[in-house]
């Protein structure tokens, strides 16, 4: 990770770390790097989620883009994968999404996509960072007709919805689907999509006010949707995050179906249809041991990457694989989109339910999970967790006690000032004890003082 760019663009507290001034410079520098070879007036799409800071940052970013001669098309509020799809569909030179995904409302972020709809390479991000750190801005400053322009393309949302519908062979007539839109970017999109697919819909977390994004709702709070599914007697629930690139499902009896299980269900179905490229799925080190055991039983190969959907996508492109993702709900169907897409993943999952005639609880039960616990600890310097001797010592002690019947993963978050402690073991009691033992040392050594 660089000085500005993390694993998912530039993020920080809006108007404090991610300021309008920085957004303006990102517009100039990022726009220049991505469009300088295009010719006159390249086109760049700009979108945002529902955060109160979104319009402020959007205005500054667009000013920067226009100042280097770029034609900006505003999409308004739309999901990150919607932007990625429309970039390629509209023949744009690049696009920018203003969002901090599942982070709290105080945060915001800016991420770029190239003309192919994929996130930027490390080299491209490094070039933008070098320009940001240059003392004097020497980029072109056109005037008159050389300046860029701004127009609206709000109908892009409907084009994206129509595309999603074409990726499945079934409608959802007869299904009652509960939706939790995290008061974020899918709030209008999801209900429109599932209504078009003839489903009965109950929705929550679909009334954004600029301040309530991810607030007790969405994919990071699936327990809220679980209760809602039971209350509404729905067949399935789908919880998205703030920018719509993740989904966590809930089955008809209120059980959480995470990204591992969604990938497992879809991989099995695609394999049966002869559509799983190289009979392989790409996942990260966070996936449950039970996920890999289940894949082996199905004779499906797996490729494992570092945490972060960008690394999953890189491995998928390198190996020409078409399914991959993360336990957190970032799932990539590379035949259909270039990034994690909550809406796409949700309709693919329900399409499997309809095609097989099985309830989600039946499909999910085919993968047995190891007990797993994840603790997120807010720290002063997350990157020092890897070289802290006391943390290393307690990890080694726990791993020795496990004797191969479990695993430990302690790592810095790529998007927040957190250390994540993940433990899997043979029993829930062991998992809880090991996780708390390691977490206590991390807190003692590194945690911020409240």
Curated annotation (Swiss-Prot):
Modified residues (Phosphoserine): 101
SUPFAM superfamilies cross-referenced by the UniProt entry: Phosphoglucomutase, C-terminal domain, Phosphoglucomutase, first 3 domains
Source superkingdom: Bacteria
Cofactor note: Binds 1 Mg(2+) ion per subunit.
Pfam families: PGM_PMM_I, PGM_PMM_II, PGM_PMM_III, PGM_PMM_IV
Annotated GO biological process: carbohydrate metabolic process; peptidoglycan biosynthetic process; UDP-N-acetylglucosamine biosynthetic process
Positions of Mg(2+) binding: 101, 241, 243, 245
Disulfide pattern: none
Gene3D superfamilies: Alpha-D-Glucose-1,6-Bisphosphate, subunit A, domain 3, Alpha-D-phosphohexomutase, C-terminal domain
One GO cellular component term noted in the UniProt record for this chain: cytosol
Catalytic activity: alpha-D-glucosamine 1-phosphate = D-glucosamine 6-phosphate
Keywords: Isomerase, Magnesium, Metal-binding, Phosphoprotein
Example GO molecular function: phosphoglucosamine mutase activity
Post-translational modification, as annotated: Activated by phosphorylation.
Cofactor dependency: Mg(2+)
Entry's family note: Belongs to the phosphohexose mutase family.
Protein name per UniProt: Phosphoglucosamine mutase
């Amino acid at each position: 990770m660089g000085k500005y760019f993390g694993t998912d663009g530039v993020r920080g507290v809006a108007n404090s770390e991610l300021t309008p001034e920085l957004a303006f410079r990102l517009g100039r520098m990022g726009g220049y790097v991505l469009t300088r070879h295009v010719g006159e007036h390249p086109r760049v799409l700009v979108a945002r989620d529902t955060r109160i800071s979104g319009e402020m940052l959007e205005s500054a970013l667009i000013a920067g883009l226009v100042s280097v001669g770029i034609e900006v098309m505003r999409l308004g509020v739309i999901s990150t994968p919607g932007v990625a799809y429309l970039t390629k569909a509209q023949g744009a030179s690049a696009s920018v999404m203003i969002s901090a995904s599942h982070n709290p409302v105080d945060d915001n972020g800016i991420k770029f996509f190239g003309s192919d709809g994929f996130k930027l390479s490390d080299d491209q991000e490094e070039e933008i960072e070098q320009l940001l750190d240059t003392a004097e801005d020497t980029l072109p400053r056109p005037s008159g007709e050389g300046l860029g322009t701004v127009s609206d393309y709000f109908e892009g949302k409907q084009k994206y919805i129509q595309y999603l519908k074409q990726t499945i062979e079934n409608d959802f007539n007869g299904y009652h689907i509960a939706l939790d839109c995290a008061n974020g970017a899918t709030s209008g999109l999801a209900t429109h999509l599932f209504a078009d697919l003839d489903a009965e819909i109950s929705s929550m977390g679909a009334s954004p006010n600029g301040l309530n994004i991810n607030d007790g709702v969405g994919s990071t709070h699936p327990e809220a949707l679980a209760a809602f599914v039971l209350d509404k007697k729905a067949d399935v629930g789908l919880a998205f995050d703030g920018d719509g690139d993740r989904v966590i499902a809930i089955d008809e009896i209120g059980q959480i179906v995470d990204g591992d299980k969604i990938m497992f269900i879809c991989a099995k179905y695609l394999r049966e249809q002869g559509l799983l490229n190289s009979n392989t799925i790409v996942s990260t080190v966070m996936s449950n041991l039970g996920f890999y055991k289940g894949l082996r039983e199905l004779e499906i190969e797996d490729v494992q990457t570092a945490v972060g959907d960008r690394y999953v996508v890189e491995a998928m492109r390198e190996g020409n694989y078409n399914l991959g993702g993360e336990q957190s709900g970032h799932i990539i169907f590379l035949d259909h989109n270039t990034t994690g897409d909550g809406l796409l993943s949700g309709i693919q999952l329900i399409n499997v339910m309809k095609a097989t005639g099985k309830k989600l609880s039946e499909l999910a039960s085919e993968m047995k999970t190891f007990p797993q616990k994840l603790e997120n600890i807010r720290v002063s310097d997350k990157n020092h967790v890897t070289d802290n001797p006391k943390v290393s010592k307690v990890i080694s002690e726990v791993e020795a006690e496990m004797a191969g019947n479990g695993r430990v993963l302690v790592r810095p978050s790529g998007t927040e000032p957190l250390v994540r402690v993940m433990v899997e073991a043979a029993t829930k009691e062991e998992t809880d004890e090991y996780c708390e033992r390691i977490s206590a040392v991390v807190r003692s050594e590194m945690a911020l003082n409240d």
